Structures are given as C-alpha cells and as structure tokens.
Amino acid sequence: MFVLNKFFTNSHYKKIVPVVLLSCATLIGCSNSNTQSESNKQTNQTNQVKQENKRNHAFAKLEKEYNAKLGIYALDTSTNQTVAYHADDRFAFASTSKSLAVGALLRQNSIEALDERITYTRKDLSNYNPITEKHVDTGMTLKELADASVRYSDSTAHNLILKKLGGPSAFEKILREMGDTVTNSERFEPELNEVNPGETHDTSTPKAIAKTLQSFTLGTVLPSEKRELLVDWMKRNTTGDKLIRAGVPKGWEVADKTGAGSYGTRNDIAIIWPPNKKPIVLSILSNHDKEDAEYDDTLIADATKIVLETLKVTNK
C-alpha cells in the first residue's frame, strides 16, 4: 500500500494522468467526429434520394403530358454531377448519328483529305436532300458533305459519309474501338429511322450516345483542330432551335444534332456552354407507342429545363 501511495503521489503520476485524460478526450472527440460524419453522409444520401425522386416525378409527369417515353443522360463536366432517366434503355438514334459519323470521318481522315470530291447521281439521293440535290452535277467534298449532314441533316450526305467509312458496320467498328459497346449501326438512310419496339439495330442509349458525343467533342479522340470543326458545325446546326436550344437561357452556347423517326421518335444530343462555366453534355431521346405518332419539340425543351434545374446551373 505504501508503494502504491508513493507512486500516485510522485512525479510519474503527475505525468501520466494528463496523457491518459488527453487520450480519452481524443477518443471521445474521434467518436463524435465519426458519428457526425456518418450522420452527414446519411443526410446527404437522403437528400439525394429526395432530389432524384422529385426529378423522376417531373420527367414522368412530362411523359404523361406528352404521352411519350423519355430517355435522358446529362453530365455537368464542372462538377461531374449526372442526371439519368431511362439512361440505359434503347432508343432509335435516327439522325443524331450523323454527328457521330462525321466524328468518325474526322478520326479516319486528315484535314487535307476532307478536300476529296465525292461524286454521286440522282439515284443516290435519299429522302431528305436539301444540300446534296443542288450539287449532283459537280459532287461535293467530304468537308462539304460533313457540313450538310450535321448542319442540315442531309440524308444523302450521311449515306455518302457512311460509304466513305466502309458502311454502317465499319462505322460501328470505329465506335467499338472508342469504347462504345452499345450503339448499333446497321442501315443507311432512310431505313435507319424505322425501328420497331424491341429492335436493337440503329439504336443507342442516352448514356452511351452522350458519352460518345463527349469523346468526339471534348475528349482526346480527335485532335483540337478536328474537334473544333465538328463543334463549329454543331453550333451552327439549323434544325435544333425548338429543342434543347429552346430549353436553355439566352446567351448560352449550344452545339447539337437532332433526329426524328417512326413511333414519334424525337431526339437531340448536345454540348451546352453556360457563360463562364465548363460544358454540359446532354442527350434526350424520346418515342411513342404508336408507329404513326407525331412528336412535339416542346417535350425536348421542357425536359432540358428540368435537367438544368436539377443540375442547379444558373445564368450567373
């Protein structure tokens, strides 16, 4: 007993007690910190679920209003936040594939090679030829065909580009080499626009087509000079004013490619530049139950507004 009393009254005890107390305080502090961290994590997860439910409800409400099915994928490259709704479901890609085919053309050819003149006859004209029908006698360069395909959705221009690539299967092979294992290309215009429910030819998913568009326009698949060409053509697209462009605030830049087909298919894929911010990648695909259904461009514009509201992207 004498030894213990001596120990607790000597300098050793005076040194040990503060250390023990500090250790206990540290453990308690860590425990509280971990508990707080876990609580914050659970709160964030709960808020995220609530936000997703609210967003999905808004998209479902649009689907009911327009009697359509929506497929959406968006990526805000400044925050890496995504918006996904039926993002892995297949939809007919229709003419949105024209931007990807031009991207593939740029990948396979030098800038100088785009000056090659391609000749064709009236028998080669497809169902929609606002530019190519004017140049049957002279032909058009690959660069001119790319411009016509992306900016005017000229179907003959698209077919000639596909032939230059080696056909739809060769185009698909290029996409596979880029890592797109989803997008299926099997036919030329105008047949590629006719896709029945359950068929997978000439289809993609909102997520896959958005990722591939991102690779061509913002990634390293193409050197900067070629990326700039594709983006410039898409920014000057003449067919998209009532779709994604109509859903973004004034002053925002949009580079897009539209598409339409059977079953009321209406699509738009785009890169969006809010002022002084990094771009947003967005794909909106849609269709209806009936083969002869008509589409409504406002559906795409309204869906765009919900996406931007979800991403909380402002005009500031």
From Swiss-Prot:
Return the annotated region ranges for Disordered. Answer: 34-53
InterPro entries assigned to the protein according to its UniProt record, in alphabetical order:
Beta-lactam/transpept-like, Beta-lactam_cat, Beta-lactam_class-A, Beta-lactam_class-A_AS
Membrane disposition? Lipid-anchor
- The record's active-site residues are 95 (acyl-ester intermediate), 191 (proton acceptor)
The residues that hold substrate are 257-259
User: Which Pfam families does this chain map to?
Assistant: Beta-lactamase2
Q: Where is the composition biased (Low complexity)?
A: 40-50
| Any one cellular-component term (Gene Ontology) | plasma membrane
Report any one BP term from Gene Ontology: beta-lactam antibiotic catabolic process
**Membrane-crossing residue ranges in chain numbering:** none
Superkingdom as given in the UniProt entry? Bacteria
- Keywords assigned: Antibiotic resistance, Cell membrane, Hydrolase, Lipoprotein, Membrane, Palmitate, Signal
User: Which Gene Ontology molecular function entries are recorded, alphabetically?
Assistant: beta-lactamase activity
EC number(s) of the enzyme?
A: 3.5.2.6
Q: What residues show lipidation of type S-diacylglycerol cysteine? A: 30
Covalent lipidation (N-palmitoyl cysteine), chain numbering: 30
Q: Which residues form the signal peptide?
A: 1-29
The record's subcellular location field reads: Cell membrane
Q: Does the keyword Cell membrane apply?
A: yes
Q: Which family does it belong to?
A: Belongs to the class-A beta-lactamase family.
Q: What else is known?
A: The class A beta-lactamase family has a specific amino-acid numbering system, sometimes called Ambler or ABL numbering and often misspelt as Amber. A multiple sequence alignment was used to derive a consensus sequence and then the consensus was numbered taking into account insertions and deletions. This allows use of identical numbers, e.g. for active site residues, despite differences in protein length. UniProt always uses natural numbering of residues, hence there appear to be differences in numbering between this entry and some papers.
The name on file for this protein is Beta-lactamase 3
The protein's organism comes out as Bacillus cereus
Name the gene.
Answer: blaZ
